[in-house]
Amino acid sequence: MVRFKKSIFSLVGALFILGACSSNSASPESEPADEGEKESKETYTIGVTQLMEHPALNLATEGFQKAIEEAGIDVEYDMQNAQGDNSANDTIASNFVGQNVDLIFANSTPSAQAALSKTTDIPIVFTSVVDPVGAELIESMEKPGGNVTGTSHHHPDSIPKALEYLKNELGAKKVGTVYNAGEQNSRAQIDKIKKQMDEYGLELIEATVSTSADVKQATESIADQVDAFYCITDNTVVSAFESVADVATTAKVPLLAADLDSVPRGAFAAFGVDFFEVGHGAGEMAVKILKGEAKPADIPAEPPKTLKFMVNKKVADTIEVEIKPDWEAEIYE
């Protein structure tokens, strides 16, 4: 896409120059162009690699682009989506390296890992990553090192708040979750949940999937065993979130999500972050890098600043759960 745009620009430029030469030969007295008019603003190429299409990831990309726009930087984007295929992630990353893009924006853990496996020179800014240290993208949040930095979407209070709510407000004892064990992003969250389950007297009932096509059946397989569902930010499951929501609502089992964007899609409630803001933060980092103000190694990776609680009133009414004023929830109607 980027090369196609550049070839069109080159053709137009050539025609303009030919026209100008013809005009000058006919009018030798013509004034030369002002030097300022000859100067062109530098354009940067950013390769955008996103694991798949779903609202949370899409919002993160939009937030990233908004930050670039606000900075007034002239950018051409090469937008690529792996559609959930890890081999496609590798191909996309290799192509970006071959094009020698100025920066890679990697939206998801697998996308960032693929990019880092292909280059240690081109700056990489990630987002939508739960545990960037555990994913071996950076050395530490404070001092990333190497050519990578970015923003995590995992708020440190999200899991404790969710488990406390499931236990104390919903009275759950057995909590079901569906996830793709092949996603490092998901394994990190499940590990955190398991470490805290005993503290809240909860039992985790798991069902794993490989593709989005497996999600509905996996959810159905445990629906009659649980008091509530907790849907982590697993890309495979979130891409088919409506399947989880349909099963949970039909069974009148509360479905608590880990991202706010799942509430309009049928979750009963969510403790989550604004993915647009998370992506915007990554965009601000990219601006510093492109302007030469800082290197990725010197820009601390950031967790989200704000955790919000949202409840879907329609779903609450359907599953007959009363929304309590002391929840201080944002209500989606």
Where are these regions (language model features)?
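Structural motif
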Residues: 76-98, 208-222
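Extracytoplasmic "Venus flytrap"
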Residues: 32, 37-65, 71, 78-87, ...
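Bacterial lipoprotein signal-peptidase II cleavage site
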Residues: 19-38
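Hydrophobic alpha-helical segments within soluble ligand-binding/sensing domains
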Residues: 132-174, 274-294
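Beta-alpha junction/loop-to-helix N-cap segments that form part of ligand/metal-binding clefts
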Residues: 81-139, 234-249, 253
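Flexible loop/hinge segments that line or gate small-molecule binding clefts
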Residues: 114, 119-157, 257-269
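An alpha-beta-alpha
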Residues: 46, 64, 149-200, 300-315
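Hinge/cleft segment of the Venus flytrap/periplasmic-binding protein
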Residues: 288-333
